[in-house]
Amino acid sequence: MPEFLEKLAQLRQVTAHPEVCNWNEIYSIYGALAPDVRKLNTPDTITDGIDPRRIEACWPEIRQIVRSVPSYEACLAAMRQAGCKTTIQEVGKDPDFVRVSFRFHPYMRRRLSLKRVSHMLELPADLF
């Protein structure tokens, strides 16, 4: 599992709130793809129907599901064994690009992911 998920699963409880998005910033990141991203997130977003209290109440089960995913080390070992590139440098991307991409990628698809839900959580600054 990615390091982000491992860190998230370590949180014993969370405080959730409705998702607040700076759509101007999000659309500016997507540039020419902004109209497509807008279509995926209007008139409502994938998180609009989620009650933050439900996330808090279900957090123990969410953690259990996250923990069922193979560890970061196991995934990394499998990728290396398969000959995959495993570092930002090997992929040839700028670290700033990767940081921005990790923050904004949940808006490019209309899928409820733990990364998208994480934008509804009050998280420690060092989690990322």
Residue map of PLM features:
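C-terminal charged capping/lid subdomain of soluble metabolic enzymes
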Residues: 3-128
